Regions:
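Histidine-centered active-site/metal-ligand motif
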Residues: 38, 98
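A common structural microfeature
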Residues: 30-33, 56
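Catalytic core of membrane glycerolipid acyltransferases/transacylases, capturing the structured
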Residues: 41-63
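Divalent-metal-activated hydrolytic enzyme cores
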Residues: 1-31, 40, 64-79, 85-91, ...
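Well-ordered alpha/beta subsegment
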Residues: 91-97
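Divalent metal-coordination and catalytic microenvironments
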Residues: 35, 59, 95, 178, ...
């Protein structure tokens, strides 16, 4: 903790030097993307994307779970998503999973004990679980999906149940990307919706959820 305090104070200058005074009305966040990922400490969105402070609006949850939309749910995840798309008007959403996810592995091996009632409820809710992968080929063949990838695609499906997402997609003002970061190699894969497979990430890779046709 002492190291954290020493690094946090004092700062020689604001971390984001935009050339705009902090008290000016225009000094407000204008992130380029909403980055949804796991709370795992090995995943560092700004390092992964090469972005500076102010360029990413981050949403981190245990197991990078995005619950299905419920109009009556008082959910911080839903509120953050709605704020990013409605108030901040981010043009891109990046849903990023990762390999060797401790939270997912713990759930698969043994659900959290009764001593962790909130975590147990979070992981055992049916709305959070990936369904069967209809496109998955025989285990071990090229193109087959891992349980982590199936989980990630389930969250993509959940994301598309939110009205704030569907509205923006329908008006072609939002792109949704699905990535998987490999903790061991540092490589990132992207979901190619047209080919229905994960491919090495590259600029030409189409968005996982393309805008709806006019």
């Amino acid at each position: 903790m002492r190291t954290f305090v020493s690094s946090a104070h004092p700062l020689p200058h604001p971390p984001a030097d935009t050339g705009v005074a902090a008290d000016e009305p225009s000094h407000r966040p204008a992130p380029r993307a909403l980055f949804i990922t796991c709370s795992d400490s090995r995943v560092v969105p700004t390092l992964l994307t090469g972005t500076a402070p102010g360029e990413l609006h981050e949403l981190r949850t245990t197991g990078h779970i995005v619950p299905r939309y419920r109009s009556d749910a008082h959910c911080g995840i839903a509120a953050t998503l709605e704020f990013a798309l409605g108030a901040l008007q981010v043009p891109d959403v990046i849903l990023c999973g990762h390999t060797d996810c401790t939270a997912l592995q713990s759930f698969e091996d043994k659900p959290p004990s009764s001593e962790l009632p909130l975590a147990r409820n979070w992981f055992t809710r049916p709305a959070h679980r990936p369904g069967p992968d209809r496109d998955q080929r025989a285990a071990g063949t090229p193109g087959s999906r891992t349980p982590e990838q199936r989980h990630l695609l389930a969250q993509l499906h959940h994301l598309r149940t939110y009205p704030c997402v569907t509205r923006r997609l329908a008006t072609r003002r939002l792109r949704v990307h699905t990535w998987q970061y490999d903790d061991r190699t540092g490589r990132t894969l992207g979901w190619d919706a047209a080919a229905r497979t994960f491919r090495p990430l590259r600029p030409a890779l189409p968005a996982a959820t393309a805008p709806a046709a006019r």
